[in-house]
Amino acid sequence: MDLIPNFSMETWMLLATSLVLLYLYGTHSHGIFKKLGIPGPKPLPFLGTILAYQKGFWECDIQCHKKYGKMWGLYDGRQPVLAITDPDIIKTVLVKECYSTFTNRRRFGPVGILKKAISISENEEWKRIRALLSPTFTSGRLKEMFPIINQFTDVLVRNMRQGLGEGKPTSMKDIFGAYSMDVITATSFGVNIDSLNNPQDPFVEKIKKLLKFDIFDPLFLSVTLFPFLTPVFDALNVSLFPRDVISFFTTSVERMKENRMKEKEKQRVDFLQLMINSQNYKTKESHKALSDVEIVAQSVIFIFAGYETTSSALSFALYLLAIHPDVQKKLQDEIDAALPNKAPATYDTLLQMEYLDMVVNETLRLYPIAGRLERVCKTDVEINGLFIPKGTVVMIPTFALHKDPKYWPEPEEFRPERFSKKNQDSINPYMYLPFGSGPRNCIGMRFALINMKVALVRVLQNFTVQPCKETEIPLKLSKQGLLQPENPLLLKVVSRDETVSDE
C-alpha cells in the first residue's frame, strides 16, 4: 500500500503553495528586530518566542536583560515585542509621547463590553473615560471613602484571630484574598460581604470565576497566534471572559443603580455611586457622561485591577516582614507611636508614617505585581536613535528593572531604607514603576496604597508574623498571570497580646 497519496500535480502544487503561504504568514514579522540590529531569542514559526515564558514572564525578562543588555526583541506569536530598559526611552514612551504615539495598551483578543474599561479602551475614548474617572480617585474622594475600607480591617483581624486557636499556619492568600474581595465589592458595587466566611455568596463565586485566567488558555492562544480571529470572535460575541459572569455584574449594576436612583442616595461614597453621579453632571457635551455599559465595564475592571494585586502585595509584605523581624519590629514601633493603644488608623495618619511608606515601596520593588508595562506604537518613530516600527508593542520589564544592580545595589536584599527621604533623590523615577508613569499610569494607585497601608497597620497592631516550617524560603513565583507565589504562602501568626504577656 502506498504511503504517499496519489494526488494530481495540480493538487501537489496547491498543497505546496498553501504550506509556503502558511509558513510565510507565521514568520513574516520575525525578521524585524534582526534588520534593526536588536538582539533576542530566536523565534519559531507561529509561536514566536512564547516558549521562553514557560518559567514565567519575569524569569524570561531577567534572563534576557542579563544576556542582551538594554533592549531585546521578542515575538508573542507574530506580534513583535520590543523590551526597553533605558530610563530616557522609558520616559519618552510613558510620558513625553504618550498622547501622540504610545497611547494604547495591547489588546489581548475579544473582551466584550470590557473594551469600554479604562485599562483597555483606546485613544479618544480612553481620554474621555480617564477624564471622567479621575475625580473619583482624588485624595479628597479617597478620604471620604476611607471608612468603607477601614471597616473591613476589623473583619480581617477577626478572621486572623479565629485561626490562632487551631495551631495551624495561616495562608496569607486566604486572609488577604478575602480582605481584598470585601473591599473591592464594597467600593465597586456597594455590597458588604465577609467573603472568607461566605464562600457561597454569588459575588464571591462570580469574582473567583472571573479571575481564573491562564495564558495557555486555547482561546487566548488562538488570538495570540492568529490575531485576525479577534474581530471574528467579536462578531460572534465570544469573549475571553465568561458570559454568565459579565451578565451577572451587568444585571447587578443595573439593579443597584435603579435602587439608588429611587432612594436618591447621593450621599453614599463608593466608586459605583460616584460613577452614577457623573452621569448627572451638567456638561456642555452630554455624550461625555459614562454610559451604563461603561459603568459596568469600569466596575468589572476594578475587580481585575484591585483583587489579585492587593492580596498578593499584602502577602508578599507579610512574608518579607516575617523573615526580617528587625524591620517588622521597627514598623510596629512606628505604628504604636502614631496610634497608641491600637487606636484606629486615619487617612491622614497613614500618609504621615514614613517607615510604613518605605516598607510598602520596597515590597513593590521586589514584587511589582504587574511585572510588565506595555504600549503599542501607533506610527513609525525614532527615539534617541532607536527606530520603532508602527504596530510594535513596546514592553517595559518592570520586574527586571527593579532587580537591576546598576540602579539597586544588592537588588535581592529587602532594604526599606532605600526609600528614605535621604535616599529618595538617588532613585531614578523610571527605574521604579510599580504603578507605571505618565498620563496612563494606574489610576487607582492612591487607592491601592491606602488599602495596603491600612491593612498592614491593623494587622501589625494586633499580630506578629513569623516563618514556620511550612514557609517556603526563598519564595518561588508562579509562572502564570500576575506576580504571585507558586505555592500557598504560609506563616505563623502570633497575637501581640500573647507576645507582651510572655515578655
UniProtKB/Swiss-Prot annotation:
Under which name does UniProt file this protein? Cytochrome P450 3A13
- Membrane-topology annotation of the record: Peripheral membrane protein
Give GO MF terms, alphabetically.
Answer: heme binding; iron ion binding; monooxygenase activity; oxidoreductase activity, acting on paired donors, with incorporation or reduction of molecular oxygen, reduced flavin or flavoprotein as one donor, and incorporation of one atom of oxygen
Localization per Swiss-Prot or TrEMBL = Endoplasmic reticulum membrane; Microsome membrane
InterPro entries attached to this UniProt entry: Cyt_P450, Cyt_P450_CS, Cyt_P450_E_CYP3A, Cyt_P450_E_grp-II, Cyt_P450_sf, Cytochrome_P450_3A
Induction info: P450 can be induced to high levels in liver and other tissues by various foreign compounds, including drugs, pesticides, and carcinogens.
Q: Tell me the residue numbers annotated for binding heme.
A: 442
BP terms from Gene Ontology: positive regulation of gene expression
Pfam families from the UniProt entry: p450
Q: Which gene encodes it?
A: Cyp3a13
Family membership noted in the UniProt record: Belongs to the cytochrome P450 family.
* Listed Gene3D superfamilies: Cytochrome P450 (1.10.630.10)
Q: What is its EC number?
A: 1.14.14.1
Gene Ontology cellular component list = endoplasmic reticulum membrane
Functional description taken from the UniProt entry: Can activate aflatoxin B1 to a genotoxic product.
- Swiss-Prot/TrEMBL catalytic activity: an organic molecule + reduced [NADPH--hemoprotein reductase] + O2 = an alcohol + oxidized [NADPH--hemoprotein reductase] + H2O + H(+)
By its UniProt entry, which PANTHER family does this protein fall under?
CYTOCHROME P450 3A5 (PTHR24302:SF38), CYTOCHROME P450 FAMILY 3 (PTHR24302)
Q: Which UniProt keywords apply?
A: Endoplasmic reticulum, Heme, Iron, Membrane, Metal-binding, Microsome, Monooxygenase, Oxidoreductase
Whether Transmembrane helix counts among this entry's keywords is: no
